[in-house]
């Protein structure tokens, strides 16, 4: 290489690498910096910011404060909110005092939520993570299998949590993981299985160590595991696990234990609503032994010492869910219609009709959005084209029941019914 060619080669003023050794070289007044040095500087600044944030920890809200914040997003379920507020407060109080040397070591208390579909189990867990500003991940127990079998490995749950916090291991250690449909991995009988149960008892065994606390080896950035790879080591001892499930027919096991109701010819004949109310009362009496009879192994039940139940939402609760929370469905659709310069008004009879349909479909609060979305589909499809001159749209029970179209109120009219164009 000639001396002239050497003079033409540019070098990073910080690491000394040439322009051929790096992807990009940025020029400044008499200096050059490469992309690798820029990335390194960003990493140093990010680490300092994390350290400063860790040093100035936010004040942990008290149980009543947590309860009040849950009230802003979750309607009803007062007992469950109280239990969760205390459990979460104690968990993070325990984490905040771990550095202090003390002879008493406080064990982690994971939580089991029992309640019908759409009663608010997932929302409660999500809202807790939002209140406490900690990473949160959801896993579906029905997709999990033992390691080595086709399906999702239980350690993938930790990977989901890492993804939520940009693979910050220290932050992930303080997160919350919600495992839904936990009742679906119950074994069929309460006696040990003689055959391999890949998605039932086997998954419970695989989850045991993870929930209690172990060091999980997770591939970086979501890659697949292979022998030559360096893994991220994540200690799960401080991760709060909340498990949830409907536990259908659990009340029958509790009924046999408590022997509250007669059977056979002497049994009292009661309406369907009474059976539902009685089942709800029985579920509140759930004990660890009932869960073992249901099909959860004793060791797994032992890792979930806090058990709380959620009630089935009635019509009044569903109507309140539509309007009261910060992110209530009615408020969301009002905002969507505001973007088009149109006001939308849901009358009380419409809210009642939506709630009734959700109860009929047995979807609880989870089904409310799909009912409203289906009802407003044609209207939202045509709205951008007809919004000019339109001031207000009124939704009543007739619209929900598909018996009549919405009421359109124009700026120059009082009220008229218009059929959305098909």
Curated annotation (Swiss-Prot):
Keyword NAD included in the entry's annotation: no
GO biological process, one term: cell division
Residue ranges annotated for the ClpX-type ZB domain, each copy included: 1-53
A GO MF term: zinc ion binding
GO cellular component terms given for this protein: HslUV protease complex
Residues annotated for Zn(2+) binding in this entry: 12, 15, 34, 37
Positions of ATP binding: 116-123
UniProt-listed SMART domains: AAA, ClpB_D2-small, zf-C4_ClpX
Alphabetized InterPro entries for the sequence: AAA+_ATPase, ATP-dep_Clp_protease_ClpX, ATPase_AAA_core, Clp_ATPase_C, Clp_protease_ATP-bd_su_ClpX, ClpX_bact, P-loop_NTPase, Znf_CppX_C4
Keyword Ligase: no
Keywords recorded for this protein, A-Z: ATP-binding, Chaperone, Metal-binding, Nucleotide-binding, Zinc
UniProt record similarity statement: Belongs to the ClpX chaperone family.
Binding partners and assembly: Component of the ClpX-ClpP complex. Forms a hexameric ring that, in the presence of ATP, binds to fourteen ClpP subunits assembled into a disk-like structure with a central cavity, resembling the structure of eukaryotic proteasomes.
Function: ATP-dependent specificity component of the Clp protease. It directs the protease to specific substrates. Can perform chaperone functions in the absence of ClpP.
The protein, known as: ATP-dependent Clp protease ATP-binding subunit ClpX
Organism listed in the record: Coxiella burnetii (strain RSA 493 / Nine Mile phase I)
Gene of this entry: clpX
